[in-house]
Amino acid sequence: MDEKKNEIILFENQGVKLEVNLKDETVWLTQEQMSKLFGKAKSTINEHIKNVYKEGELIEKETMTKFGNSEFADKPTNYYNLDMIISVGYRVKSQNGILFRKWATSVLKDYMLKGYAINQKRLEYLEKTI
């Protein structure tokens, strides 16, 4: 992931606050960020990701990218795209997972019934920056 072409948006909901990387028309999260999002241990998120790949639901080279070196890590960090975030969200068993599934289902329902879905907060933010 190229840092210079990477937009970061702030996601905040139900006490969860994340800086989300937005690039190539998708969002990218680390396992640590997914752990916070879904309220589960990083090891649980890792296990779900492994199973998604093992079961052939998604392809690793299409859903994961390595990005940067931090002062705390010897190697780049793995980032996973929205396809993986959704797959993990439908597998994880937690209160945050339930909220995520309800949100994802409502967005899908809007697309199916209305033909579109609107992220009102994002739209308002973009209007302020123009």
Q: What label would you give each PLM region?
A:
Residues 1-31, 37, 69-130:
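Positively charged, aromatic-accented nucleic-acid-binding surfaces
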Residues 32, 43:
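Key DNA-contact positions within bacterial/archaeal DNA-binding proteins
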Residues 51-55:
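Alpha-helical DNA-recognition elements
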Residues 56-71:
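Short Lys/Arg-enriched helix C-cap and helix-to-coil transition segments
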